[in-house]
A protein has these predicted regions:
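Short beta-strand/loop motif that positions the catalytic acidic residue
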Residues: 181-183, 187-194
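Active-site nucleophile loop of the alpha/beta-hydrolase fold
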Residues: 140, 144-154, 171-175
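Alpha/beta-hydrolase fold nucleophile elbow
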Residues: 113-125
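Glycine-rich nucleophile elbow surrounding the catalytic serine of serine-hydrolase chemistry
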Residues: 122-133, 196
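An N-terminal hydrophobic leader/cap segment in hydrolases
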Residues: 1-24
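Short glycine-enriched nucleophile-adjacent loop
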Residues: 53, 128-143
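Membrane-embedded segments
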Residues: 26-111, 117, 135
Length: 197
């Protein structure tokens, strides 16, 4: 986990002309998650809601391009910082990130009133593993994965082939296994020029 690489905020959706509602979501285990809800647009019904789970380094203020893209496509969006990232409380952990994702889902379906059939779950890099876990336990309209990995042990073994990473890894984020439990349509986006994942 690299939540401390840049916990500072660069900007908000307002800096790119988007209206937003700041969020402070409380997880079942008492952490507070910082986030934003960006409505689809003035007077326009949303085509649905995209819940965005970002990658490892940085925070929600570094993902304004996703908020703009989904807004321009007619979707509302909800983005959170996992525990230990950005302004969220707590300490980063695999299990904690799954609880955080479920907290965002609960807010989307209960407080914002979106039915599951109108929610797209989007995950980038580390967020892809978080999004996959959520989609395996809930039934979103779709799961979109961008530049993600099959599992942390697989990624580690590719980067360090001479080390027994698969045996030593405590953090798993096993998306390959969880994808078999996802019943929603899945779109995987990846670049051949991505030299990290």
């Amino acid at each position: 986990f690299q939540p401390t690489i840049d916990r500072g905020f660069q900007a908000t959706p307002a800096s790119i002309g988007l209206g937003f509602d700041p969020l402070a979501l409380t997880t079942p285990d008492g952490e507070t998650l910082d986030g934003w809800h960006v409505p689809a647009g003035r007077g326009k019904p949303a085509r649905g809601l995209v819940i965005i789970f970002h990658g490892n380094a940085g925070n929600i203020s570094h993902r304004l391009d996703y908020l703009r893209m989904f807004h321009d496509l007619g979707f509302a969006s909800l983005i959170i910082d996992y525990r230990g990232y950005g302004r969220s409380s707590g300490r980063a952990s695999e299990e904690g990130s799954y609880i955080d994702a479920d907290t965002a889902w609960h807010h989307a379906t209960q407080a914002l009133g979106y039915p599951a059939k109108h929610i797209v779950v989007f995950g980038e890099s580390l967020g892809g593993a978080v999004a996959t876990q959520l989609a395996a336990t809930r039934q979103p309209a779709a799961l979109v994965l961008a530049s993600t990995f099959t599992s942390v042990p697989d990624l580690g073994a590719e980067i360090y082939p001479w080390l027994p990473i698969r045996l030593l890894a405590r953090i798993r984020y096993d998306s390959r296994d969880r994808l078999s439990q996802v019943n929603s349509p899945v779109l995987v986006i990846h670049s051949l020029q991505d030299d990290i994942i």
